[in-house]
Each structure stands twice: as C-alpha cells, then as structure tokens.
C-alpha cells in the first residue's frame, strides 16, 4: 500500500501544486473581487454535481458490486455491467448538464441570494459555459474508479494536472479576449481533457466497448438502491460549500474568493493524502470485507490512519501557526492586496483546525462502503450539515468569514467521530490504543518542529526548518521499521 500510495501522492502533489498556481494566477489577474466571487460561485455549483458522480458516490458503490458480480457470474458479464453503468452515467450527466444551462439563472438566484442583480447575471453566464464540465468529469471519474480497481492509480490521479493546465492557459492567454469568462472556458476544456486522459487507457484495458444497457441486470437495480443513501451522504458533505457560499454572499466583496482560496490550500493535504490513500486502500479493504477478514481490515485501516496522521498533523500545524505566511507566499501578487491576504489567512486558520477530520472522513467512509453500508455515512453527513448550517447562522454575525470556516471544521469533527466509533462498535474492533499512541507521538514531533521554526522570518526557510526538524525525529524509526512504523503488533 505504501509504495502505491507514494507514487500516486507524487502525481497528486504535482496536480495540487498546479492548482495552487492556478489560484495564484487568478488572484494576480483578478484579485479578490465581485468578478471572482461570481466565478467561484458558478464553479462551486458545477463542481458540486461533479463531486456527486465524478469522484464519489457512483464509483464507491460500483466497485464492491463489481467484485461480487465477477465472483458470481464471471469476467464477461462483469464487463457488460461496466458498460451498462457507464452508459447510464452518460445519459444522466448529459441531462443534468442541459438542465443546468436552462435553469442557470434560477440556480444562481437560489444559491447566492446576497449578490446584486448584475453579478447574478455574470454568475449565470459563467455557469452556462461550465455546465457540460459535469458530463465529462462524471465519465472521467467513473472510468478512473474502474482503472483504480484494476491497480492503475497513476493515470486517474494525473487527470487533474490537465484540468489545472487548462485553467492556467485560459487565465494567461484567453483572459485577454474573454475577461472572467476565460476561466469558465478553461473549466470546460479541462473537463474534456480529463475525460480523454482516462478514456484511452480504459479502452486499452477492456479492449472493447458496448453501448448496450442491460436494464434487466439485477446488479443495475442494486446499484440504484445502494446509490441513493450514498448520494445523500455525498450531497450532505458537498452542500457545506454551497451553504458557506449562501452565507458569504451577504458579507463584504471578496469573502467568497477568500473562502475559496483558503479551502484550496487546506484541501492540498486532503487531496494529496486523504483521497490518495483512501483510493489505494479501498480495493484491498473491499476484498478483505468480502472474505470476512477482520484482522486484515483492522491492520489496513489502522496503519492507513496512522500514515495519514503522520502526513496530516504537521500540515495542520503549518497551516494553523503559519497561515498568513503561507497565503502571502502563494497569493500575494498583482491585484491580491494586503486586506485580501488578511481575510484569506483568517479563513485558512479556522479551516485548518478541522484538517485531521476532513482527511479521516475520506478514509473511514471508504471502510463503510467496503462493508456495503452506505446508509450510516449518509446519516452522519446529514447530521454534520445540519450542525454546519446552525453554526454558520450563530457565528456569522460576530466572526464573519472566520465563523463560516470554523463551523465547517467543527461539523467535520462531529462527522469523523461518529463514523469512527460506530464503525468500531458495529464492524471491526480497531486497535484504537495504537492509533491514539501514534497520534500523540506525531503531535509532539509537530510541536517541536513548530517551536524550532516559529521565530524565523523568511517563510521558505521557516517551512524548510519545520520539515527538517520533524523528519529528523522520525528518520530512524522509519529506517528501522519501514511500513511497520505505522502499525506494530
């Protein structure tokens, strides 16, 4: 797991760094303005639908059913199942994309109530341009899940590189001709590129394709039944961002942009560590669950959580204690002024408090899906979203943008602990003692590294000192025990 995770993390890291550079360019050319608020609002809506199918519910529901069908009915029938699901995905995504174009103005009116009428028109136009991004990214995400299942992790992980390059190109060159619309065209082109990157390896893997949909297949019906609670869960998690936008639309201009830029920074470790390790681990947990191998599931999950903590806890300390330094380093160029730095750094600090929880939810949710339990993650996500809405309402008056970020962190923490403890109670008795002890050791190492770097003024040197001091404390244990440093029996 560790070797595959590291290879995929390197690719994902490249993609996420390009994503930060993309954000830097948008900040440089457009600053934190009403136009960027309109762009990020429209993008969040199209991206929200992408999260439902593109990299979430559908793939996680499909993979366990695919393994079961292959075991019961053989290779050929399982291939036909893949084609049926992909064809249904195409039809559904196409319909949703068309509906987004038709009803774009109504969607914008509903989501960002606080925008002026002129700004709503801009956001509606941008959403129309980006609508078909959902079609391409849904197909890309589904094909990527299938490639992951066959052990091809690098290709799906690389798709976001092309997406980021598309928006970078659009910001640098198309901006001259289309202004803020250039970013929307970049999103659409990026979606097409992501689809093409996985489409050809997918065809090479399966060697054929069929446009047939077998609606009589009991596994198609079973997929629909299991998908509903999964969709509710993913919907609830993603609605957090939409809820934040709704409240932020009533704040000063640039607040939505600040939340978006801050979330992109804290989502760097979530994407690089949480999503990567979860995707690599999911097929093996699914197989262990199918064989009722509880010890194997315990070992895989605890070692993965420890490995995630090793990567995430130091990231949490950096983003919390050095938030302003990090934002200055990434965004403080061109039209991105000192006030924009200040509010973005404040958002980052409060988002980062929940970093461990965001990452943990990614992994533990996969453990539920491997067990065929799609309902509990959905219920816990709904609980978290209700808490997030209530906390947003309570915090926004006194804490403005900071309150929105803090509410997201708290609700994510509730979601994570519900997932973890109910999983331990109902499925596998995880070695929580090992997990807690390792977490304490990593936290102590992070405190020492923070103390060593805190008073250094140069931000790059500060981050280097932090990294060196932290890694030196773990160099010998990792050298001696290798993977076993994260789970020793």
Regions found by a protein language model. Give the residues of each.
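Membrane-embedded alpha-helical bundles of multi-pass transporters/translocases
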Residues: 1-489
